[in-house]
Amino acid sequence: MLLTLTRNLYIIRVQHIVDLHTQNAMMARTFLLSPTFFSKHASGELTAKLNNVATLCGMINETIIGAGLSAILSLIYFLQLWIYGRPLLFPAMGIIACQLLLLVLTYRRSSHTQSKYTERAARLSGLEYNMFAGIQKIKLTGSEERAFTRWLDFYTDEARLIYNPALPTRVYQALTALLGIGGTMLIFWSTLSNHIAPSDYIAFSSAFGMMTAAMAQMNSVMPSLARVKPLLDSVRPILLAVPEMEAKAPQVEELLGGIEISDLSFRYQEDGPLVIDDLSLHIKPGEYIGIVGKSGCGKSTLMRLLLGFEKPISGGIYYDNFELAKVDKTSLRRRIGCCLQSGSLFTGDLFHNITITAPWATQEDAWEALRMASLDEDVRRMPMGLNTVVSENGNGFSGGQKQRILIARALISKPDIIFFDEATSALDNISQKQVAENLDKLKCTRVVIAQRLSTIRHCDRIIVLDKGHIAEEGTYEELMAKKGLFSEIAFRQL
């Protein structure tokens, strides 16, 4: 009783300490991983993997303490068996050896089952996350029944592993019970054959029973032990991934705005085609650059490379005198205002959605950023103004309003460089014109990807991409006069 109480108190105390430190460390490590890592793992699956960390810590703690205590007690009971019944020791050890064999077989089978369960549970979590994130699309297309059927297929595969264990597992459980009954009969028969005194038999039986109980306790720990390896395998991608931030990488405190792209090449897969093919480009500080091209020409990929979200297979990118591959990318991105196609709003209020890139910003700064994004008048008409509640995914705001909030977020930190990737695609012509005029007035370096040519009409230079390399470059008027790829794209919009 005292040992059990001590064991339980120790498990609770240690588990709280381990959970606190491990969860903090894992979450901090996950935030330091590169964007490429997150693009390869679904958000729901990552959430499930991180939740597995707490489960894993608890199981390791409980398994080590439980199995360790059982092993210590087994040694004590073995000494008692040796003292009171040496003639009975051989059959007793034979029974215990059979129990250990069943434990090993149960562990191997349970580990295999738990590995499948952990994998399918992560897949189910990812599916649920994606379904709830896209619930409007499911409702819009009337696909509730199909979505539920797909979820049910995933859930059935997961539940079958738990509620309908494989035949060997059930056989092992039955053999364990039969072994206990058969062992007792064998010990009693050996007692009669060896003429063991009743007092010694009672002492031996008591010790053997307690040793068997200790083995049964180890058997109860076995399901937890079997889950340790699958859970560890599930979090292994996070543990093995190389953090994006290097400890000794130089910090970027300020940028002049110059960008140099030298012989840059990139592909997403080793055997895939080059998305960026030996591209070189020089951007002067304060220059206003527009990038256009047909779909799939590499515009967004180039933007991801400029931000360090992807690593090129050859070539390099330089900001002023800093090589992107060798600087602290987090400090660099703080000097860049960025609005990507995949940008999204956070649950909270409008003010904190805008100032998340500039925690020091005041309400006056937020209003100025909204003015630059041509959204200030819309927000003033809202009853709660900057305190307007933003729900998940920005429901309640139009597509154009969401984009302008993201533009305000990119501008509020007064960045040295601005990157926009289709940042005004959902805006009406009037709002788009106002945003474009405000961008024209900025003195920082601006790189804008746009299909709508009115957005980049006044750029200092327009870069036309085709199949991952620069096909044309020049001002709007120069490119139109060439009657090449740019003029072809332009005429399609007339």
Question: What name fits each language-model region?
Answer:
Residues 24, 28-29, 33-45, 116-164, ...:
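Loop segments that connect adjacent transmembrane helices in multi-pass transporters
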Residues 239-290, 323-325, 364, 368, ...:
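Primarily ABC-family ATPase nucleotide-binding module
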